[in-house]
Amino acid sequence: MTRPLRISIAVATAAVAALALSSCASGSGNSAVGTVADGKLTIATGQPAYSPWVEDNKPQSGKGFESAVAYAVAKEMGYAKSDVVWKRSTFDSAIAPGPKDWDLNIQQFSIDAKRKKAVDMSSAYYTTTQAVVTTSGSKAVDDTTIDSLKKDAIGVATGSTSIASVKDVLGVTPQVFNSNDDAVLALKSGQIDAIVTDLPTAFYMAAAQLDDGTVSAQFPADGKGDQFGFVLPKGSELTSKVDKALQTLDDDGTLKQLQTKWLSSETNTPVLK
């Protein structure tokens, strides 16, 4: 075998190997821009996804706070609505280590240092506020001002930030219960007129734990609540791009507008004044 022939074979072998590696990379779903599908942004949420985060369990509609935020972020990143693909995942699998079949996941993930060891988390798109949960038959149902609500019997869970919020905003001392579940039982029995808890928990209580529950009002934002962020695969190339998009949406007031629309106006949950 001549030297030129040996070189030609070596080059051909290297080319085949490179092609095989390229094929493997393509098969794993990792495109050149860090998405699982070329030209698409794949976003996951829970199954089912609840209002007011996603309306009618249809994230593709763009209705609901988190669905609207997801599309706003996608637009800032250069993706048209038609280029957004939705998938479903459980909460726990989303924050577990390992590869993912989505680019972003949004379902009320609190930004947490422990979680960041397993996955990437974006900057915050929402900081929780405190809210008032009551029933349609309670005398507190129409008390949507500080002066009126402070006259009601308010319950909170022990160890929660709700205790300080009630004292600071309403100027009264609430009844403290061992858990949110105990507070719900007290509300059902008429022992208290309303519960104060964080807004996401309030929506859950009203929808799932109370037959005639309603979130009647929310406290003014104080910036002290849990912060929600997107979850991304560990080391994702998109994390910095999502952060940049969120910063733009915060600076131009879009996040505030979406929060007002979907967590206040559409839910008829006024801010206490």
Positions of PLM-derived features:
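Acidic, polar ligand-binding/catalytic clefts
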Residues: 83-148
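C-terminal motif of bacterial Sec signal peptides marking the signal peptidase cleavage site
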Residues: 18-23
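Ligand-binding clefts/hinges and TM-proximal coupling segments of bilobed small-molecule sensing domains
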Residues: 26-31, 83, 162-174, 244-273
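Extracytoplasmic small-molecule ligand-binding "clamshell" domains
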Residues: 30-105
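Periplasmic-binding protein-like
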Residues: 47, 127-134, 200-203, 207-244, ...
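Short helix-initiation/N-cap motifs at beta->coil->alpha
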Residues: 84-96, 141, 160, 175-189
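Alpha-to-beta junction loops
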Residues: 79-81, 99-108, 153, 189-201, ...
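Extended ligand-binding regions for polar small-molecule ligands
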Residues: 25, 67, 71-76, 227-266
